[in-house]
Amino acid sequence: MNSKVLITYCWNRVGYNIMRSLAAHDIDVYVADTSKRNICSMSKFVKGGYVYPDPFKEEEGFIKRLLEIIDHLRPEVLLPTHDESLVIAKNRDKFPSWLIIPVASYRLLADLSDKQISTSIAASLQVPTPHIFHNVEDVKSFPVVFKATVSNSAKDVYFPDSIEELLDLIHRYEGKKTLIQEKCKGCDFSVDCVRGKDFFQASVYRALVTKTEGGGTTTQRVIVDYPELVDYSKRILDKVDYLGVCGMDFKVDEETGQIGFIEINARYTGGLATPIAAGFDIPYIHYCLYTGKTFNRDIKIRIGTKTKWLLGDVITLVGRLVSFKLSRKELSQLLDFDFDAFDDFRKDDKRAILGEMSYYFEKLIKNRKLNP
């Protein structure tokens, strides 16, 4: 009998690439999400799908529903993929002792998700970090970065150009934890890591296109060789003894070589398709490390591998057109289809992208936003 894995937060391309990775190794993959129709539920590789309440608005109902699914399905592994990891880790003692949940402790996940705490950890390890302004009076030049200490996908991140804009943001976010930092120049680089008790492997990709201006969610990426960023990432994970999958984001000024640490994503990251396409099968390695299965540790990552998120580029194009901020160079890049793989489309599974499009369309109608 094949092993069963239940994956949560499966509306997007990340869950899709995890599902494909595990299914390729004859693992029966079941998915669960707040939505019934999405990229995973319409894939031919899924064995079954479930719906649960919003984990961030209905925590008790979410956990209760997960327990019902687990009791019915009896999976070997419950695999959280995004910020619901925190909710599951917080309630870990409510799950059966035989169930493998490959995430860190709630306390560690919460600390690493906090940009102020993670930046302090990085700075203590001599990892280059942007300067933090503790008082508005200390800001002498603009733009700066103003952001909530806990957020994702470039949400709640702003680049005020004046003291008036900054003060307005401070007023709007009164009572919430926020951070003011110097704005780093350069391009987004991300380090995808897997760390076990006797294992560490990482790959680095450079962003070619980001969905929002100033960085954030990437829609096109290329694998690069950047040992310095890998070393910085390993320092941080070793320091906190983090086990599992993790992403580190940096800004790099390629003209000066100046590096700036941005954040830690103590979970699977949006660019997951890129390392997988390059030969670094992160989901399967993660699964093996926690289940005791063997895998090929002679990992050869193919530098230069490029991937593209098709729907993400469409959303990016629309967003740039609406805001009148589309350059000829970026238009040419968005219309490029010369890639090694696509995040959300495979010829052997054409229906899946229809599920993704359906999900985004429903969110657009409901929320009037292109960033769900």
What is the role of each PLM region?
Residues M1-V103, M357-N371:
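ATP-binding N-terminal substructure of ATP-dependent carboxylate-amine bond-forming enzymes
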Residues G49-K57, H131-N135, Y158-D161:
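Short acidic-hydrophobic, aromatic-tinged amphipathic segments that line or gate anion-handling sites
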Residues P96, R107-P128:
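Glycine-/Pro-rich loop/turn segments that contact NAD(P) or position catalytic residues
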Residues S118-A123, I180, S233, H286:
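Structural element of the ATP-grasp superfamily
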Residues A122, H131-H134, K140-F159, G175-G186, ...:
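ATP-grasp fold ATP-binding core
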Residues D161-I236, V240-D241, K251-V252, Q258-G260:
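Phosphate-binding site of ATP-dependent enzymes
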Residues E228-M248, V252, A266-L317:
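Active-site "cap" helix and flanking loop/linker of ATP-utilizing ligase/carboxylase catalytic domains
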Residues C288-P372:
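Peripheral (often C-terminal) accessory segments that flank ATP-dependent C-N-forming ligase machineries
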